[in-house]
């Protein structure tokens, strides 16, 4: 059947998004470009099948091949992260975190998590999120001078508040996280440790960031971002009793039927992550980020939070350009460079404006951008921020963006049919 003829309105919307992805330089740190294999797996007939339960223990018949798919995803994840137990069913990272909390603490218990403005995530205790509404969260931040995690201050807060659980991990933190120090702090106050490695999972998988699994009671992650899989979540542990709690808190605790077509996409992505090529990909992410950081460091107006990066992302304070994050995001979008406004440590503006933008390299690296390309992209960003009212300059930047995206297509052979 011809999709375009049957539903031209929907077809056009998807085709337009495909073109946007092709023509834009995607720098949102939580986004990536999945492989054709992941697309094929996620668009397969597995979407037709209900499969409540777990492999070998389903509430529906006809799941023998579904079990093969889910076990592939589980086994590959175990191999990637050195975990004894893995649940690949969470529909998202937020749902993975919800099930993890339910497995570790009770409503009203005290939990420590990273402050959202300092780089944490909504599910790490934001008052507008279920986490902040269900549990008593105490936030920790970063050092005012270095803008890096201050483990002595985190330990002091832990001694003061005696949390039942400490959450490590971030959504906008550009430095290495020392999970062994978090484990020491948790042990000192008798707390459990949960790590949300959503942003860095792909780097962890290939040894480019310390692995939290040996230190954490429970580790959660998304399966997209640096892991370059479909949008979804996952939970890992080495504790058999916690694994049982996790399974029951995912199903039936927070979800019904798993999305087996998405789990197939996860299995495909995990298979790719086990290859030598994926380690090369991770190394290129780091090199591209470092190259962008060098370019920003040479500009007197550009200020990088924590003065650089150890991973896949950068936080750029744009106030010296006479802009806020919202304005910078909109301005860059005009030349087909996509970033997101982002709060910075000790933020003074609202989350709807912010003082900074977040820049990530996973998606452009998937497209084949190298260090030279990444340096050029950083220069283009600086040119735009410094010339917000010069239409001629902005038009020239847009032309250079087109040259870069034409040279690095998102899918050489794929287009919506």
Swiss-Prot record:
EC number: 2.1.2.1
Name of the gene: glyA
List of residues binding (6S)-5,6,7,8-tetrahydrofolate: 116, 120-122, 350-352
Compartment(s) of residence: Cytoplasm
Pathway recorded for this protein: One-carbon metabolism; tetrahydrofolate interconversion; Amino-acid biosynthesis; glycine biosynthesis; glycine from L-serine: step 1/1
Entries under SUPFAM superfamilies matching the protein: PLP-dependent transferases
Site annotation Plays an important role in substrate specificity: residues: 224
N6-(pyridoxal phosphate)lysine modifications at: 225
PROSITE patterns in the cross-refs: SHMT (PS00096)
Subunit note: Homodimer.
GO cellular component: cytosol
Reaction equations catalysed: (6R)-5,10-methylene-5,6,7,8-tetrahydrofolate + glycine + H2O = (6S)-5,6,7,8-tetrahydrofolate + L-serine
UniProt keyword list: Amino-acid biosynthesis, Cytoplasm, One-carbon metabolism, Pyridoxal phosphate, Transferase
GO molecular function: glycine hydroxymethyltransferase activity; pyridoxal phosphate binding
GO BP terms, alphabetized: glycine biosynthetic process from serine; tetrahydrofolate interconversion
Listed name of the protein: Serine hydroxymethyltransferase
Function in brief: Catalyzes the reversible interconversion of serine and glycine with tetrahydrofolate (THF) serving as the one-carbon carrier. This reaction serves as the major source of one-carbon groups required for the biosynthesis of purines, thymidylate, methionine, and other important biomolecules. Also exhibits THF-independent aldolase activity toward beta-hydroxyamino acids, producing glycine and aldehydes, via a retro-aldol mechanism.
Domain of life: Bacteria
Record-stated family: Belongs to the SHMT family.
Keyword Protease: no
